[in-house]
């Protein structure tokens, strides 16, 4: 089976977070699906601006752990716009063998605990 590319895995993470944001009634202003271009989502909710950084993480790494330097930089940028800043880590693993890479047409497991606000 053909392994998924970094961009394809990032797109899976974007889909997970995008569905979560939609379910929570966020209004999408900007969506950027490039993995290293932050933030990936700029949204409005209750007339407040929100910056969301999405990161796809492969097992065995923990999707809740983030790069504090990067997130502080994004928060500083968000503060200029009076935006709240969030990290959304989405973990993935091959469903049948966590040691295998993710591949096309193979099931996978998702580990997503929601948005973590950067304060």
Predicted feature locations:
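Domain-level recognition of nuclease-like catalytic cores that cleave nucleotide substrates
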Residues: 84-119
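Short, charged, amphipathic alpha-helix that recurs within catalytic cores of restriction-modification
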Residues: 64-81
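Active-site beta-strand-loop-beta-strand hairpin of nuclease catalytic cores
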Residues: 42-53
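Short coil/turn segments at beta-strand junctions that form active-site/ligand-binding loops
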Residues: 26, 48, 83
